[in-house]
Design a protein with these regions (language model features):
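Conserved CoA-thioester-binding segment of acyl-CoA-metabolizing enzymes
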Residues: 1-57
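Hydrophobic alpha-helical segments typical of transmembrane helices
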Residues: 82-86, 143-146, 155, 207, ...
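Crotonase-fold acyl-CoA enzyme core
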Residues: 6, 89-203, 237, 245, ...
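Glycine- (often His-adjacent) and acidic-residue-rich active-site loop
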Residues: 34, 41-42, 48, 55-92, ...
């Protein structure tokens, strides 16, 4: 068994990042956050990676983060919050990301899942954002910003203000996850999706991701210009010409990410 609180495996251009502290509910502490950030930075520099999957060992995805003492100074607290930040490096990944949520994703665990482009969960998974409800904390890693972008303002306020548990089926109905599958097929379902994405044109996938997320932060006119610019750039790539050539030759394309 791997002794690290988080680690990565790479196979067939798919990197699987695994939270690995099941005895503690895969709780996010400074050590795990540091390891995850290092992994994400290195993966973003690896041009051979086409897809990143985030998963966890044990019966839960992550039940949250380590408690921060109320006796700390503002400076000390700010430093710990900075050290616990994972979302910045996760969302900077150029390639598509999939959260394979194998169990409860609470508080910081939910915030990590929100950073993924696609979320698949098991039928036993529950979600909760109870930082405000328990009165001891406040979202620290993008929860108040990414949750409404995924499920809308009303559902976000519902989850934040009540701290209630959202089960897998409700999560699917409000758009929090893309798919719900039985626990015993979650890994295979995720693997099949990751393989499908990895078989596509890596550069085109990256440009699509850039267009969608950057477009959400600018007006429609500028977003359309960005889409056009990326389209023009894409036409000059090897993968674009290979896609056309393979179609004409009636064979599977062999993309190089170039």
């Amino acid at each position: 068994m791997n002794n690290y609180t988080a680690y990565v495996t790479i196979k067939d251009r798919i990197a699987t990042v695994i939270l690995n502290n099941p005895s503690e509910g895969n709780i996010i502490d400074e050590g795990m956050a540091s390891t995850l950030n290092s992994i994400f930075i290195k993966l973003n520099e690896d041009e051979n990676i086409a897809v990143v999957v985030i998963s966890a060992t044990g019966p839960v995805f992550s039940i949250g983060r380590t408690q921060i003492s109320s006796e700390l100074s503002i400076h000390e607290r700010r430093q710990i919050l900075h050290d616990l930040n994972i979302s910045d490096n996760l969302t900077r990944l150029r390639v598509p990301t999939i959260a394979s949520i194998n169990g409860d994703a609470m508080e910081h665990g939910l915030e990590i899942a929100l950073c993924a482009d696609i979320r698949i969960c098991s039928t036993s998974t529950r979600f909760r954002c109870n930082d405000l409800y328990n009165g001891s904390a406040f979202p620290i890693d993008g929860g108040t910003q990414r949750l409404p972008r995924v499920i809308g303002t009303s559902w976000t306020m519902d989850m934040l203000l009540t701290g209630r548990i959202v089960d897998a089926q409700e999560a699917l109905s409000i758009g929090l996850v893309n798919k719900v599958v039985k626990n015993d097929i979650l890994e295979n379902t995720t693997s099949e999706l990751a393989s499908l994405i990895a078989s596509g044109a890596t550069i085109a996938n990256q440009y699509a991701k850039e267009a969608v997320y950057s477009g959400m932060e600018i007006n429609l006119t500028d977003g359309l210009r960005l889409e056009t610019d990326l389209n023009v750039i894409l036409q000059s790539t090897y993968d674009r010409s290979e896609g056309i050539k393979s179609f004409l030759e009636k064979r599977p394309p062999i993309f190089k990410g170039e």
